[in-house]
Amino acid sequence: MFLPVILWTDALVFALLAVLLGALLRVRRSAPLRASWRRVWRNPAALSAALVLSVFLLIGLLDTLHFRPALSAASVPVTASAPGAASASAARYSSEVRSVLDVLLAPLASRSERTYSAPLATHAYARETIELPDGRQVREFPRLRHGGAHLVQLDDWAEDVMLRVLRGLVLALVLWFVLSWMLVIALRPQAEGGTQDRMHDGSRMSAAEFSAQVWRGQSEIPWRSLLITLGFLLALILPIGMLVPQYHVLGTDKVGQDVLLLSLKSLRTALVIGTLTTLVMLPFALLLGMMAGYFRGWVDDLIQYLYTSLHSIPGVLLVAAAVLVLQVQIETRPEWFPTTAQRADFRLLALCFILGITSWTGLCRLLRGETLKLREFDYVQAARAFGVGHWRIMRRHILPNLMHIVLIAVVMDFSGLVLAEAVLSYVGVGVDPSMNSFGTMINAARLEMGREPMVWWSLSSAFVFMFFLVLSANLFADAVRDAFDPRLHIGGRSA
């Protein structure tokens, strides 16, 4: 039994998914949009980046499904004087808010150590005073409570790790072969009616022949790049899955928490910052940019003065001041947030709003310049001559011709917003300290890097996860820009 919990950021993420679903349906009904997205998928790097982003998004969505677990009857006192108390106690729920990802990663969360331990280690990273059975005290590296605890002989460590990695690689190879063949079977019917599934003599191409065509790179969509990326992901994930039950793959932090768990939990924060901030930024940029470019005159002067003044203020200083003011309000009114999760979620949502309000100026300038050009086109002048209202002209004729700029800017700003959260959390004005994020991991690693011996794996883990998240977002953004920018296409072909 559990009680579903929808936090503010959860509701906005679900709303964003609904918008994406609506956009997908619109793309299916629009031939020009289908052609543009087909140009995106023809890019091998974009297809591989989309697969990596999908894995990150899946982890983030699993961490967005929150609930409160039910308390067991033994943990709730039942009084005999209250009729139906047993049934009432069965309906009580814990104050702890968990997610589906927490349930899946419960073995990692329950296997905490006392303090630091290196990746795949069997002993602690620092010496401790240990009392021997004869009463003597010595300084040595103690055995971990969970990491490598199954090993009877420490000499078997290398063999055990290699066997687990080998089993994971074999399982990855088998699973990759099955998924690849299923993908080929699923894709071949979509090619029916075209020329790519026909032999030179006109006969129908078999599944094996279509698979050979895919691996030769002769298919319209570069499925070979997708399958190779899928193979690398499986070869990385499954061996780690084999090691996780017995080892801390990425080590532990100061309080003994598994660093792999912290890194996976930090993905939701990065994705929420990158997506929800865009939802806040777009209305300001769209409305003010179109108004400035369409109406011109004093409206243009006023909007230019507004975003020029806002852009002249140092961004980090403005965000830090707003976050600190909000933090004072949160701490002085604890009754607003019954649980720690609600307080941390509200601070994350507030950070998204603050970043969105302070980062719309660049897109607004682009939309203003494009609107200044669009308002002089003949179809806009004709609409004005026939008496069509200004707002209807902007909605029907200006806005659709700005969407390629909006889409390109949104995708390209995602990586910058992810890095902005890390910087703000590093300086102490980011998300709540109780919330996992790459910024808090980097902030904690600041002192760990200066100790002796140096603890390097927390910073390295945050760097690797952020690197692949931002790299895949940038590669996908480049493909979207190349596909949707009309200046790069002349007569339906790339210039």
Write out the residue ranges for each language-model feature:
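Gly/Trp-centered helix-boundary motif
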Residues: 1-281, 430, 434, 439-463, ...
